[in-house]
Amino acid sequence: MIEFQRLHKSYSVDGRQIVALHPLDLRIGPGEVFGIIGHSGAGKSTLIRLINRLEEPSGGRLLIGDEDVTALDSQGLRALRRRIGMIFQHFNLLSSRTVAGNVAFPLELVGTPRAEIDARVAELLARVGLQEQANQYPAQLSGGQKQRVGIARALATGPQILLCDEATSALDPQTTASVLQLLAQINRELGLTIVLITHEMDVIRRVCDRVAVLDAGKLVETGPVTEVFLHPKHVTTRRFVSEAEHLDEAELHRDFAAVGGRIVRLTFLGNGTYEPVLGRIARDTGVDYNILSGRVDRIKDTPYGQLIVALTGGDQTAARAGFVAAGVQVEDLRV
């Protein structure tokens, strides 16, 4: 478990104190994929770099298991960092080394015997699907392949925690999806705790179990991704969700003005996403409906659907009760 206890970070610039991260309390469970999302300058990179003390905290405590990371001396810090792997936005590969040489590098630094290094490198390149590229150099690789090398290198010392600092923001959508799929597979098969920072809610939706939302150095919302994504509370979170769903709130409200009736948002979760609930309830209650917006997608492995519909006529009270009885979440947008 990773636990932040009133951890905070400030800088002194020209005699002024700049707060990068306000005091926060947060727990990340063992084996979970935890997302940290925020706009540029929100403090997310500072937060993740406090975990392995690439940034020194200004106050508070950070516990990994029972160990107080903030109290470690240099020897303890070196031991900690061998248990924490990290991948970066711009890969940070050594251009003069081959793919295999990059993956071997952290093992060489700790004096691992050559035979063990060779076996470990072969195992890791097979895991990330780069066996055929072992003797190529970074300049010969695509962006996605470079990030896979970065992942293999981060796993070389057998870490318990993997930190991902904007690991997909330099990649195209298709490559992003493949890298996220690889991270999910690593989490399942190795049981690693993965802490992933991003400015894209779609990345959080695809791979994370829980999420923390940062805004101007403050933790403004946290919880299971399903709950935060479907029921965002803070204005920053709502903006991230709207961007991920490609919703234009102003345009949507113009659509509201063009139709009559009660407007509701219906949220379907799990297998109920694929049931013909709307049509059945419309027939049973005599309610007419006009679909203004809709989507079906997944939050990690869980299917979900959302419809914004205008309801007119019929027994709308019975229709609402029918939706609730069917496990559909109903939110009134206009009564």
Swiss-Prot record:
SUPFAM superfamilies: ACT-like (SSF55021), P-loop containing nucleoside triphosphate hydrolases (SSF52540)
Top-rank taxon, per record: Bacteria
UniProt KW Signal keyword: no
Signal peptide boundaries: none
CDD domains associated with the record: ABC_MetN_methionine_transporter (cd03258)
Keywords: Amino-acid transport, ATP-binding, Cell inner membrane, Cell membrane, Membrane, Nucleotide-binding, Translocase, Transport
Its EC number(s): 7.4.2.11
Record-linked SMART domains: AAA, NIL
PROSITE patterns: ABC_TRANSPORTER_1 (PS00211), ABC_TRANSPORTER_2 (PS50893), METN (PS51264)
Subcellular localization, as worded in the UniProt entry: Cell inner membrane
InterPro entries: AAA+_ATPase, ABC_transporter-like_ATP-bd, ABC_transporter-like_CS, ACT-like_dom_sf, MetN_ABC, MetN_ABC_transporter-like, NIL_domain, P-loop_NTPase
Reaction catalysis annotation: L-methionine(out) + ATP + H2O = L-methionine(in) + ADP + phosphate + H(+); D-methionine(out) + ATP + H2O = D-methionine(in) + ADP + phosphate + H(+)
GO MF annotation, one: ABC-type D-methionine transporter activity
Domain ABC transporter, first and last residues per copy: 2-241
PANTHER family noted in UniProt: AMINO ACID IMPORT ATP-BINDING PROTEIN, METHIONINE IMPORT ATP-BINDING PROTEIN METN
Subunit structure: The complex is composed of two ATP-binding proteins (MetN), two transmembrane proteins (MetI) and a solute-binding protein (MetQ).
UniProt family annotation: Belongs to the ABC transporter superfamily. Methionine importer (TC 3.A.1.24) family.
Function: Part of the ABC transporter complex MetNIQ involved in methionine import. Responsible for energy coupling to the transport system.
Protein name stated in the entry: Methionine import ATP-binding protein MetN
Annotated source species: Xanthomonas oryzae pv. oryzae (strain MAFF 311018)
The organism's taxonomic lineage, starting at the top: Bacteria, Pseudomonadati, Pseudomonadota, Gammaproteobacteria, Lysobacterales
